[in-house]
Each structure stands twice: as C-alpha cells, then as structure tokens.
Amino acid sequence: MEVNNMSKTRVYELAKELNISSKDLLSKLSDLDIKVKNHMSTLEDEEVELIKDLLAEKPKEEKQKDQKNHEQEAQDKEEKEIEEDSFYEDREEKRAYKKSFKKGGKKNKKLQKKFVSEESAKEDEIKIITIPEFLTVKELAEKMKVNPTEIIKKLIAQGIMVTVNQQIDFETASKIAEEYGFLVDKEEVKDELEAIFEDTPDREEDLKPRPPIVTVMGHVDHGKTSLLDAIRKTNVTMKEMGGITQHIGASVVEINDKKVVFLDTPGHEAFTAMRARGASVTDIVVLVVAADDGVMPQTIEAINHVKAANVPLIVAINKIDLPTANPDRVKTELSELGLVPEEWGGNTICVPVSAKKNIGIDDLLEMILLVAEMEDLKANPNKPARGTVIEAKLEKGKGPVATVIVQNGTLQVGDAVIAGTTYGKVRAMFDDKGRKIKKAGPSMPVEILGFSEVPEAGDKFVVVENEKKARELAEKRREVQRELELKKKQKVSLEDLFRQIQEGTVKELNVIIKADVQGSVEALRKSLEELSNEEVRIRVIHGAVGAITETDVMLASASNAIIIGFNVRPETNAKALAEKEKVEIKLYRIIYDAIEDVKAAMKGMLEPKYKEVELGRAEVRAVFKIPGVGNVAGCYVLNGKIARNADVRIVRDGIVIYEGKIASLKRFKDDVREVQQGFECGIGIEKFNDIKEGDIIEAYTMEEIPR
C-alpha cells in the first residue's frame, strides 16, 4: 500500500516539473475529465504520462493551427472584398433614389413631410428627462420646455411656496414632471471624493504578479510570535544577523526569489477592526494551533472571523516537537468546525511545524506560495499608489508616522497623499528593515513620514496631484465624517428588521450567540437557523460560552450582526463599545423568548412593550450572616446607583445565577432609598442567601415603551 502511495505525484509537483502554473494544470485536468480537488491532490502514474504526452504533442497542433489561421485569413479577405463591392453598389442605388425623390416635386415633399411628422410623433410618445437631487424651478422649466410660472402655480397648489430661482428636491420635481407626461431619471452625480478613492479597473496587460499579504492568527501562547520569528530567521542573511531589525508592523520574507509579506498585527482583533473599517488587506491567513492544546476558544473566534471575511486559510499545527503533541486530535477538532484537512479528503491545508526547533517552516512557506499562485494575485505598478494604513503613531522627533501597505501602483517620496481625514506629503520612506527607500511597489509595507495628523489603522490612502488638493479633499472628508457621525451607519436591530426585509436591505440576518453552557449555544443555533425562509436567512456567525466581550462586539460591527446572550451579561467595556458601534445586544433567560422575538421580528409583529434601564452595579466585598435575616452583602457601588425598589440580578463570572428584588438597603445601619457610585452599603436579596465575595449585583428597572 505504501509503495503505491510513493509512486503518486501531487498536482503542484507535476506543474513545477512541466514549468507551468498549478492553476493552468488544474484547468487542463478538468478538460481531460481527470477529477482532482486542488493543487494538493495526487495523480496516478498513467495520468501523469498522459498529460506529459499531450503537452509534448501541443507544439505540432499549434503549427497546424497556424496553417489553418493563414487559410482562414485569406478566405476572410476575399469575403470582405465582396462585401465592400456590394456596399458601394447599395450606396449608388441610394443616391439614385434620393435624386428621383428630389425630382418628384410637391407630391414627394408632402410624403417626406408626413414621414418626418410620423417619426417625431413616435419620439413624443416617450419623453424622458434626467434631473439631479436638487435643481431650481427655472432649470426644471428649461428641461421640460415649459413656462416657469406654470410650475410655480402647480407648486403653490401643493402648498410649496417657491420663486423661480429657488431649489426643489428630486421627489417634488419628479411629481411635477409626471403631470406634464415626462418619465424621470435620477442623475448620478459622482462625488469627487468617491471618484478618487474608487480604483479604476486595470487592463490585463498592465497587471503584474504581486507578493501575497499574510496575517498570522491563533490562540494566546500557541506560538504566533515564535512562528513569525522562525520565518524571519530562516530568511535573515549573515550580514543582517548582527543588525537590529526595525519593527514597522509588517515584514517581508523572500522564498525561492519570491516575496511574502507578513503582517505583525496583534491577532484577530486588529484583523476584524480593519475589516469593520472596510479595509481588506489580507490575502491569506495562517492559523496557528498548538499540537498539545488543540482548538481553543480564540482559535474558534479566529476561524469565524476568517470565514466571515472569506479569506483562504492555512493551518500551522505548531509545537509538534513536544512529547504531548497530538496533531491528529487537532485535525479531528478542526474537522468538527468544518475545516477538513486535505489528507482526510477536505480542502484545508494543514502543515505540522515547530517554531522552536525550526521544523516544517520551509513546507509552510511553500504552501503559502502555492495558495498565492492559485489566488493569482496581481496589481498595476505603473500608476499612482493606493493602499491601506496598518499602523500609525506619533513619534518624538518624527511627528505622525504611518505604516502603510501599497495595494496598487507605486508610492514615491514627494507624493501628496490623503488617508481618512488626514493628508500630507511623503517626506521620507523606510522599508521593513529600517532602510531609507525612494519608492515602494504593490504589496510592499513601508513606514512613511509627512502626515498632518496621525491617521487611523484601516484608513485607505491614495496619491493625489498635489498637497493643496490633498488638503481640500481631507477637509471635505472631515465634513462628510461629521454628517456620518450624526446619522451613524444603521446596524440591524430586531425592531426594524421587518421594515428592512420589506425594503430589501436585509437578505441575511447575522447572529452571534453567547450562552452559559455549550448545550444552550447549540440549541439556540439550531432553533434560529431553522427560522430561515425565502426572504431572510439567519446565519449564526459565532457561538461560544461566556460573557459578551469586546471581540464579540467588534465581530458584530464588522459583520452587521446582532448579539443574543442567554443567561450571560456583557462586560462593561463591551457594553460601552456596543453603544458606540450601535450594535444591538439582546439578553434572554428563556430560549423560547429569543426564538419568538426573532420569529416575530421576521413577521413584522415585534411589539416592544418594556425596556430594561440599568441603574447601577455593585461589587460584593464581604458577606455578613445576620441571625433571623440571613446573609447580607457588604457592597461597593462601582457605577450608577443602587435603589431600594429596584430589580436585581446576581452575576458570578459573567453568568447570571439569580434574579429577584432587593429586600433591604442599608448604609451605616440606616435604611436608605438609594446609594450612589463610590459609596459602600449593605444589600439583602429577597429569597437568596448564596451570595459570595466577588459577585456583581446589577440593579435595574423595567420601563414601559410608549407605542
């Protein structure tokens, strides 16, 4: 069995031998009806021989093809000459016809007039005008060729008092135009800013291959940094060994005369934050999983982030040198998450590595190059640069410093750039080794000096004609941003889900589930996904056990999702971030309620009656046993206030363990109505004695929402 396997050849190996790309070979195999999944699939010896023979015969075929082409060209030339002769004959006939028409006198003129009037009548049947978002009454009158006074009369009849030079909006103008029998089209005015940031498609001949941009992700302590260090070490020459490499947030590695760019971003939080800002920089993600630990919560989060971004994934199973390493267990766990390894018949590339012992690093780099080849990454270096800011800071003696990735074109020293609401002129440029450079092509990470302010990570940058133009555009963007802040990007909420479905703005509802136990996560996931119908599909993009974190909120913001919490609470920072990002968090104690709410929202029957208003949070710092009363919690109010008539919930390690009412609220043995933030108090909970130090008491009231 083993001997047989040894004789098998992988697709990418054969491609290398034949000096063609894996992509071309795959298409040839498809034409020959040889079934292979991808470049890692194996081929039988007979299949390899067949392909080699066919490729050897190809030059002969091409020669015959050339001969046929010459014959075809000669035939086409003859046909063209015949066509030209007949064309000139037709033209002579036409001239003769026109002459006779002129000689025909009044009778023919009448016929001619009738013909013209019929044509114009046809044209009058459909009258279409194109108008912008706003225009004056005078401009509308000119477009429709009517008296402006008539339009003013019609507008006054509708209760709109205007003069001839006053502006009216598109809706009002289209109603007036319809009364005159016109069909109205809206004029698409392309904003100058939009036009500059919109990348025009390049011609195929201008595109050149570019290096892939790789992000390394994974759970804490699984060896992300060690792996990046190992990759760099295999690439550092003896000359560079003694020097200090400057950290700019990205590094360039050269393998077999090909470059690969690695982003040194702090894991999936930065990846998602940049995606939320609309920046798609990463071409390939390397997911690091420790062979001894296996799949961990952060690994699952990273997988969900990568799936949501639709980026190719390579799994690096690290720490295989440890005695406790179990790569097969890792592969099993990955398969359960839908990432089936190639050797098990799936599509996920898994490479066993040891960053510490430098094992399998070359294999991993080769796989990265293979995936990059399959992705066919190209860019046009011969145009003004555009790209994305990946890191930015204020440095002493340098001012605002930004690390950018050039995604298209070439960036040069002296170029005027705009990024987000900042602008500047590239005064100096440094590569990933800290060397001063004059220009940077596609996929290259560089540190640039010369911005007016510190741009934000994820901001897109583009080169413009001059600094004056860059300043004008940056000021315009600031104005646009102010307007956007006022009407913040609308996220999905259950209350307006039905309206959005009807308008056609929502075809898919993304949901993140957080619960107290894994069973609840699975139950909710199954129940919600079963609610999908033709109008809206419910997609659970992430489900996990534990409190709602900032990472969950960032994923929800990037994927326009809602968060459903079952028996869990959001962390303080997560709650603040959700308010800022306008992400909806729905909390439930009963699974049925969550399902019914989503179902009702989909049917447009959601009637909000009450909403929870958080009053304050207190931390239990001591527990006192009072005879005849039970346990009383000695608390410190962390934020807000605790009121005597409030409802409360007890939260332990992010999980709700009890809900009830306050039985007593004391301060220095005196009964009080409420205790403000920063003060200590004693709290007794109705019908609950299992209070412990470190518990959080959340006070809230239920407020009726007017309908």
Curated annotation (Swiss-Prot):
Subcellular location, principal: cytoplasm
Region (G5): 354-356
Domain tr-type G: 209-378
Pfam families per UniProt: EF-G_D2, GTP_EFTU, GTP_EFTU_D2, IF-2, IF2_N
Subcellular localization, as worded in the UniProt entry: Cytoplasm
GO cellular component, one term: cytosol
Source taxon at top rank: Bacteria
Membrane-spanning ranges: none
Cited InterPro entries: EF-G-like_DII, EFTu-like_2, IF2_II, IF2_N, P-loop_NTPase, Small_GTP-bd, T_Tr_GTP-bd_dom, TF_IF2_bacterial-like
Protein family: Belongs to the TRAFAC class translation factor GTPase superfamily. Classic translation factor GTPase family. IF-2 subfamily.
Protein name per the record: Translation initiation factor IF-2
